[in-house]
Amino acid sequence: MVSHEVLWKGSAERDLKNIDPQQVPRIIKAVESLIDDPFPPQHRKLRASASDYRIRVGDYRVIYKVDTKAKVVTIHYVRHRSQAYRR
């Protein structure tokens, strides 16, 4: 399997600063797992977009986009489940 590159948007990096520090390593580990498989069994496609997906990490949601041709996973947001789907 070909690995993907993970890019963090500024918004996702800012989101990490507002999250409980004990949860951050779990979230980073989950994001790093997307390098080998950007479509893990627990991923879900978001209805509003053709290429946006989410994974669940406890009470947090990681919203990301996959470019299969360029082999890039872009992390857009990391938010609590109550805030994750609001624009």
Where in the sequence are the language-model features?
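Enriched for short, Lys/Arg-rich terminal
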Residues: M1-L7, S11-P25, P40, R56-Y60, ...
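A short, surface-exposed loop/turn module that caps and links secondary-structure elements
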Residues: K29-I55
